[in-house]
């Protein structure tokens, strides 16, 4: 009977070891949960970025305001009749 109890105890320890420390055990599960959380956060950020890009593309296709703003900011263009003033900081 003692041999049977000893055998069952060893089996229990072996199974517990695999549960806690083995491949696909609780440690791996915890690591995977953290990885999934990081991936979901990254996906959320990318979705927001995509939405902003789609909005900008729609604005560029449909309206002239966005095109005008880009021409002013990126190319330094001005409308007819406008005067462009550039303020240069004083060098000490």
UniProtKB/Swiss-Prot annotation:
Membrane-crossing residue ranges in chain numbering: 4-21
One BP annotation, GO: FtsZ-dependent cytokinesis
Segments on the Periplasmic face: 22-92
Alphabetized InterPro entries for the sequence: Cell_div_FtsB, FtsL/DivIC
Cytoplasmic side: 1-3
Location within or outside the cell: Cell inner membrane
Keywords per UniProt: Cell cycle, Cell division, Cell inner membrane, Cell membrane, Coiled coil, Membrane, Transmembrane, Transmembrane helix
Membrane topology listed for this record: Single-pass type II membrane protein
An example Gene Ontology CC term for this record: cell division site
Source species, domain of life: Bacteria
Sections of the chain in a coiled coil: 28-62
Complexes and interactors: Part of a complex composed of FtsB, FtsL and FtsQ.
Entry function: Essential cell division protein. May link together the upstream cell division proteins, which are predominantly cytoplasmic, with the downstream cell division proteins, which are predominantly periplasmic.
Family affiliation: Belongs to the FtsB family.
NCBIfam families: PRK00888.1
Protein name (Swiss-Prot/TrEMBL): Cell division protein FtsB
Species this protein is from: Psychromonas ingrahamii (strain DSM 17664 / CCUG 51855 / 37)
Gene expressing this chain: ftsB
């Amino acid at each position: 009977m003692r041999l049977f109890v000893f055998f069952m105890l060893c089996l229990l320890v072996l199974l517990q070891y695999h549960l806690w420390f083995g491949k696909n055990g609780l440690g791996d599960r915890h690591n995977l949960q953290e990885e999934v959380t990081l991936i979901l956060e990254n996906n959320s950020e990318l979705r927001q970025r995509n939405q902003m890009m789609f909005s900008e593309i729609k604005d560029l296709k449909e309206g002239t305001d966005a095109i005008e703003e880009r021409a002013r900011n990126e190319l330094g263009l001005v409308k007819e009749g406008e005067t462009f003033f550039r303020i240069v900081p004083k060098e000490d």
